[in-house]
């Protein structure tokens, strides 16, 4: 074995000692041992260094794209923002040739279809400024564009509470309804928490509840306004993420001849509802739905097999880490539990549904629990067991392994559970690093973004990602730093070049990142 990249998802280093920091509070003897014995430093995982707007927190998709590409990958969120800015008359660089949003063929086709069929345009997506799955400003622009195009529009609002404050939905929906009043269109027809509308683990019963509200106007709750929908939910003890699908006022359902514009720019949590609305592979949920004849447009490509019009098609970086490792005749193992499996495969491979020659994939099922604070250890031990077994039996040249716990449990806002999650990962980190070393491999330990390093307060839990620097530890096969120093000022784009150096593979010209070892 030559090298391993171990990603502690959601594990960052918070310089502020005055916050509830689950990473700092946890007993992390293995991490501390490797930090002290190996070369160590920090990496930037947010803002322009990963292709996001300045100050925007990173996330797992962005992180793994940058890690695999070995360069800064301009993110769809920035592309959408810039297209809207051009529509408003601002000058923005346009290396992708996206143009302005009012010239976007896919978006315009939604308006055209609705006009031709005397229908409406239905905007749906996550209504928040979290910036992980969507920006509320993008929705506001679409509503303005609908008014400009003379189309009646309604909104199906999915509330956040995970990448934002658990009760921030009240403010976001207040702003949205005021904007809809101002534009004369785009009012909210349904409200659903992301737990239902944006499930990604094939809990189709949850997705179906959101679908029923949107298509059949059938839900367990009704409200006179979008704001009332969430405040009633708070009274029931459910924060934004868990708002049960609610019908708002007497607004219309999605009907034949209507269009849908799903404005989330991140794909993973938009796929299931999109499949239901477009009737794609309905056997997965027993074919229980019968969607109307509509035109469904997605802001970005949610899945290349869907065949749906896409406003901002993907940019696929070539010569990614996996591709280069494969083309040089080396083998690689990608390993994660369900929650992060797409990240170590699809996103690490540049957002491509491709499995390279010599690429071995192992997926460990995530626990079947409503929220991961109920089982903070998740499947970390099983991930490690699988990794060690694969190292011993297959001896891959490169291992990429993701531990999901600090991120997934951090999102629950439960501080004690997050501490347990960090400690569970630390225990497994010790086992895995020793197994890689025993096989003669170099180890890089890092993270794709922060989360558990800031859990907010008891009264106001913080459930979103952070912009804090993440650790980077280099452990040589002998357990030391191997006489190498970790340079400062690095970012995620520098990990692939570092791994290639450790594997004695020449870095391709397309990778602009630089080795982190001196």
Question: What are these model-predicted stretches?
Answer:
Residues 1-518:
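Feature captures the catalytic ectodomains and active-site-proximal regions of enzymes
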């Amino acid at each position: 074995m030559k090298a391993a990249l171990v990603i502690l998802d959601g594990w960052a280093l918070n310089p502020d000692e005055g916050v509830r920091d689950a990473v700092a509070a946890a007993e992390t003897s293995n991490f501390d041992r490797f930090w002290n014995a190996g070369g160590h430093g920090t990496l930037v995982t947010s803002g322009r260094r990963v292709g996001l707007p300045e100050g925007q927190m990173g996330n797992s998709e962005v992180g793994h794209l940058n890690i695999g590409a070995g360069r800064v990958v301009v993110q769809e969120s920035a592309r959408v923002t810039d297209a809207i800015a051009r529509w408003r008359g601002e000058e923005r660089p346009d290396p992708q040739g996206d143009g302005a949003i009012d010239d976007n063929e896919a978006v315009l086709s939604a308006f055209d279809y609705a006009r031709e069929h005397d229908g409406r345009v239905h905007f749906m997506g996550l209504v928040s400024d979290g910036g992980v799955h969507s920006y509320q400003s993008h929705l506001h622009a679409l509503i303005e564009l609908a008014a400009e195009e003379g189309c009646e529009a309604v909104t199906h609002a999915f509330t956040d509470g995970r990448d934002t404050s658990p009760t921030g939905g009240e403010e976001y929906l207040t702003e949205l309804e005021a904007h809809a009043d101002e534009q004369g269109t785009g009012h909210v027809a349904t409200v659903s928490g992301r737990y239902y509308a944006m499930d990604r683990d094939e809990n189709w019963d949850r997705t179906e509840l959101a679908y029923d509200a949107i298509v059949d106007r059938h839900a367990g709750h009704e409200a006179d306004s979008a704001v009332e929908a969430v405040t009633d939910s708070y009274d029931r003890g459910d924060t934004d993420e868990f708002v049960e699908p609610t019908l708002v006022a007497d607004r219309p359902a999605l009907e034949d001849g209507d269009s849908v514009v799903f404005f989330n720019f991140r794909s993973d949590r938009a796929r299931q509802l999109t499949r239901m609305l477009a009737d794609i592979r309905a056997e997965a949920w027993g074919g229980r739905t019968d969607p109307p004849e509509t035109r469904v447009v997605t802001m970005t490509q949610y899945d290349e097999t869907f065949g749906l019009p896409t406003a901002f098609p993907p940019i696929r970086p070539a010569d990614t880490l996996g591709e280069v490792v494969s083309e040089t005749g080396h083998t690689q193992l990608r390993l994660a539990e369900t929650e992060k499996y797409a990240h170590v495969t699809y996103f690490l491979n540049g957002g491509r549904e491709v499995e390279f020659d010599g690429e071995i994939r192992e997926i460990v099922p995530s626990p079947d629990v409503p929220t991961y604070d109920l089982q903070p250890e998740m499947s970390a031990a099983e991930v490690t067991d699988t990794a060690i077994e694969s190292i011993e039996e297959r001896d891959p040249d490169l291992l990429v392994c993701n531990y999901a716990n600090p991120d997934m449990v951090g999102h629950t806002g439960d501080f004690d559970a997050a501490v347990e999650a960090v400690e569970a990962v630390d225990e497994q980190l010790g086992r895995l690093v020793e197994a890689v070393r025993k096989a003669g491999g170099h180890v890089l330990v890092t993270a794709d973004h922060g989360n558990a390093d800031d859990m907010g307060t008891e009264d106001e839990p913080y459930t979103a990602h952070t912009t804090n620097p993440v650790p980077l530890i280099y452990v040589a096969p002998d357990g030391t730093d191997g006489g190498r120093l970790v340079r400062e000022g690095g970012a995620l784009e520098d990990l692939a070049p570092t791994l290639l150096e450790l594997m004695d593979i020449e870095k391709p010209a397309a990778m602009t990142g630089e080795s982190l070892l001196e």
